[in-house]
Amino acid sequence: MKKKLVSLALAAAMGMTLLAGCGGSTGSTGSEAAGTSSTAESAAASTAESAAASVAEGSSDLASAKVGVCIYQFADNFMTLFRQELESYLVAQGFDKGNITIVDGANDQATQSGQIDNFIADNVDVLIINLVNSSSAATVTDKVVEAGIPLVYINREPDADEQQRWTDNDWNVCYVGCDARQSGTFQGEIIADLGLDAVDFNKNGKIDYIMIEGDPENVDAAYRTEFSVKALTDAGLEVNCLDDQVGMWDQVKGAELVANSLSQHGTDIEVVFCNNDAMALGALQSIQSAGRKVGEDIYLVGVDALTEVVQYVIDGSITGTVFNNHFAQADGAADAAINYLTGAGNEHNIQCDYTKVTADNAQEILDSLS
């Protein structure tokens, strides 16, 4: 019940170029992200309402529908939560669990492409795909559309040009996810809200930070990197990037990179930004091994609100994170699939909001995840 309350309470808004964390801006703005909110909220609400009506009216025999789900990598903490919720929600809506097939792309696009080919050969009724590489979207879209199968992309957003093709051709293709610009903005705001005096341990008048990025081909990584720093500068704070490395969303890699940065830059590092919580957990290990203490001589923020990380926020071991609402996203993806199967159709971009997680609301978020 709690997770459903989270889905209902937080479902709302969302939206490419790669930037290094020490680099400049694409020209996108925070207000640009915020400006999509009302449209996205309307699309999300419409999708859910249409799906609920279809289920209530029994307009389609969902139990006999075959659903193919491609996840980029089962080892990803967040996508584990996502796929578990997706399967649970699909079954709750009337799908037969035996007709839901979820496969692991093992973070290899060639592997995932073969899995998509297999689903097409198996004549699945709808495909839900978490791409290994967002740049492969056009190729994937073409083969799935040619096969006459509705397609729901999740988590990794295809670029604007690709999404425009869906609109121009009126294809049964959509994306369900959150606006990563918002997650980056929230990360930066968590630090900015502390104030310069609290963060500027070396008293040089700047926020000295390191950035641990996710996948260089992933738009979420690009936006989180850019907008976390932009939130600081928008708050009037001067920033200094000491290091920017790619951790590929991995906890072990995150620990290694942060350990190296701490060895090189020592106490000059005041903030560690991580594009996801897995890497933040790795960063925490290295911070503690270096004899540093979050909240006393360094700050650490992530994204996803994994249960372990939220508990660390409560304990004060991690400064904050951003709740990447897997309930709303997974349920929204399932609702979109239902709408395609029942002929209701969807908007091409269906979005939901992130939630900033600090010591002030971490217990509430943790309770909702239980």
Regions found by a protein language model. Give the residues of each.
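A residue-level marker of the well-folded mature domains of exported/periplasmic proteins
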Residues: 2, 22-370
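Positively charged n-region of N-terminal signal peptides that target proteins for export
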Residues: 1-12
